[in-house]
């Protein structure tokens, strides 16, 4: 099964080797026919602490790195 790749914005870089990434998805409501925005935060592994708040990054699924980290930063 291929690994998912998502794109989002870094919202926190306070922890060592970890960034919080806000990923937004858009879809059309089936009844209202209105575009709806939903967002979700993912904690991703950042080996070199290279990314700062506001950076747009791509994250990829990986084996669990910790209790909450299942993603790692692929590129900016």
Swiss-Prot record:
InterPro entries assigned: NA-bd_OB-fold, Ribosomal_uS17, Ribosomal_uS17_bact/chlr
Disulphide-bridged cysteine pairs: none
Pfam families, A to Z: Ribosomal_S17
Gene3D superfamilies reported in the protein's UniProt record: Nucleic acid-binding proteins
Gene Ontology CC terms, in alphabetical order: cytosolic small ribosomal subunit
Gene Ontology terms describing biological process: translation
Gene Ontology molecular function terms on file: rRNA binding; structural constituent of ribosome
Protein keywords: Ribonucleoprotein, Ribosomal protein, RNA-binding, rRNA-binding
Domain of life of the native organism: Bacteria
HAMAP family assigned to the protein according to its UniProt record, in alphabetical order: Ribosomal_uS17_B (MF_01345_B)
PANTHER family xrefs: 40S RIBOSOMAL PROTEIN S11 FAMILY MEMBER, SMALL RIBOSOMAL SUBUNIT PROTEIN US17M
Role played: One of the primary rRNA binding proteins, it binds specifically to the 5'-end of 16S ribosomal RNA.
Subunit structure: Part of the 30S ribosomal subunit.
Family in the record: Belongs to the universal ribosomal protein uS17 family.
NCBIfam families named among the record's database cross-references: PRK05610.1 (NF004123), uS17_bact (TIGR03635)
Name of the protein this chain belongs to: Small ribosomal subunit protein uS17
Source organism of the structure: Ruegeria pomeroyi (strain ATCC 700808 / DSM 15171 / DSS-3) (Silicibacter pomeroyi)
């Amino acid at each position: 099964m291929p690994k998912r790749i998502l794109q989002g914005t870094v919202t926190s870089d306070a922890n060592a080797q970890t960034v919080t990434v806000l990923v937004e998805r858009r879809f059309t409501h089936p009844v209202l026919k209105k575009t709806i925005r939903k967002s979700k935060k993912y904690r991703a592994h950042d080996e070199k602490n290279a990314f700062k708040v506001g950076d747009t990054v791509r994250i990829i699924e990986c084996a669990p790195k910790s209790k909450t980290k299942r993603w790692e930063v692929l590129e900016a």
